[in-house]
Structure formats: C-alpha cells, structure tokens
Amino acid sequence: MSFVIAAPEAIAAAATDLASIGSTIGAANAAAAANTTAVLAAGADQVSVAIAAAFGAHGQAYQALSAQAATFHIQFVQALTAGAGSYAAAEAASAASITSPLLDAINAPFLAALGRPLIGNGADGAPGTGAAGGAGGLLFGNGGAGGSGAPGGAGGLLFGNGGAGGPGASGGALG
C-alpha cells in the first residue's frame, strides 16, 4: 500500500508565491520588450545595422519563448491550486469518515450510562414544540438550541456553551 502525504495549506501558499513570481517576470518582460525587440543600430554602417537586426531577432525569439513559458506557468499554478483544493477536500472527507465511527465508539458507554455523550454537540429542539435542546457532551460540546419557549441544552463542563433558548425562553446553563 502506498501513502501520500501533502499539506494543502503549503501547496496553496506555494501556488500563491509562484503566481506572484510569474506576474513579476511578466512585468519585467513587458518592460524589456520594446528595448530588446527593436534594437537601434549604433551607427549608419552595414555592420551596425546587421548586429542590431540580429539582436532584435533574438529579442523577438525571447519574447515568443517567454510567452510560451508564461502560458505553461499559468497552467502549472492553476493545477497546483486545484491540487491543493483536492487534497483539502479529500482530507476533510477522510476525517469525517473516521471521526464519526470513532466518536460513536467513545460516546456509546456514556450515552448508555448517563444519557449524554462525552464529546459532541447537543441536538436542537424541534421548532414550535417547546422541546428543550439536547445537552452537549460532558467534556466538549455546545448544547442544542431549544424549540419555541424551551430552554437550550447544557454545554460541556470543560468547553462548550449552553444552547440558545427558543423564542420566549432563556439559554441553557453550562454543565
């Protein structure tokens, strides 16, 4: 089995840096174009005219090559940016698929014994029913918002806020 390790934030930062470098090079090429493609002869003799024409031809060839390199550079930056987005999406999907079963396994004994998870947010009360919001996890998690006229659920003891009360009610307490 092979593993791929990528840091999407670092890839996105590299793409931004490369885009900045590309725009700087593009500005330098645009500034140099007039001076390198239309070189004036130093004198009126044939040798000066021929040398100026040769330098001008080299300048035009450089500008054509530079335009091709700029096109490649833009495509590379776009591919790098898209790759960073793809890696970030894959990491998020992978984390979501791992986290849910793991949290279910951690919370199962606490739900069975205490009726409250160890980690996680409480469910919101149904609107218009007056149902209270669910309590958040014992350690971590926010309480759920209460339904109309009902209090919000309790938040976690270490981290988390009590849920917002429904219309006409107060918010939940900590713990």
From Swiss-Prot:
Pfam families: PE (PF00934). Residues 1-93 form the PE domain. GO terms for cellular component: cell surface; extracellular region. The keyword Membrane does not apply. Its main location: secreted. The keyword Acetylation does not apply. This is PE-PGRS family protein PE_PGRS8. It comes from Mycobacterium tuberculosis (strain ATCC 25618 / H37Rv).
